Amino acid sequence: MLAGCQPSDTSILERGASVREQIRGVNAGTTDTIDCDEPIRSQADWELLRGVKQIRSFTLREGIAGDREASIIGSLTSLERLSLRHSPLGDDGFREIASLQALVALNIPQADCTERGLESLSSLPHLQSLRLGSSRLDGLRACEILATFPALKSLHLIDIHIKDQGLLSLSECKKLRSLYLDNAGVSQEAWGEYIIRQPLVHVHIDQAHHDRDPIKNHPSAVESK
């Protein structure tokens, strides 16, 4: 049994409950959340998750999920919030995640996907919040794909070099209200043009507000956990 997984509601399960205990809680209807602060390394523990219908929020704070585990995550059809830290999902894994049609928020800061994997997420009708990092993404093409996401309101890109043209492509995201970029390689001139095109978007660059951000006190919807 794996220790170190804890639910958000400690009145239901004691802090430090194992992933198996949390799954039992979900199946019993006492919680809809699984929150693990240590890696799930046992394939047997992963298999216990397959097809569990009542999970709405699943968080791995220390990983580790790859493409094989993504096939199990993709079977959690009620999932609305998914956070996979230290999890190098590739394109196959992203295609599995794209089957989660109820997904609203996705956080995969250490992914290993290309544009093909990212494009598969454009089919998610309710995805409002995305936090993503992958060294394999072409920045401009990634932004062109993100501009097609139908419901995206909050976006955080980590170490993806979108440069000026990528930022201007993101101005086509008409529903976007919060944009966080870390190490994006964008010039001040491009930021000026973006703010003219998208005056309602809260802008945060390299962990700081842009000095021309028109909405400095906007509460970001992007998960940073």
Regions found by a protein language model. Give the residues of each.
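C-terminal motif of bacterial Sec signal peptides marking the signal peptidase cleavage site
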Residues: 2-4
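Concave beta-strand-loop units of leucine-rich repeat
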Residues: 9, 14-48, 53-72, 78-145, ...
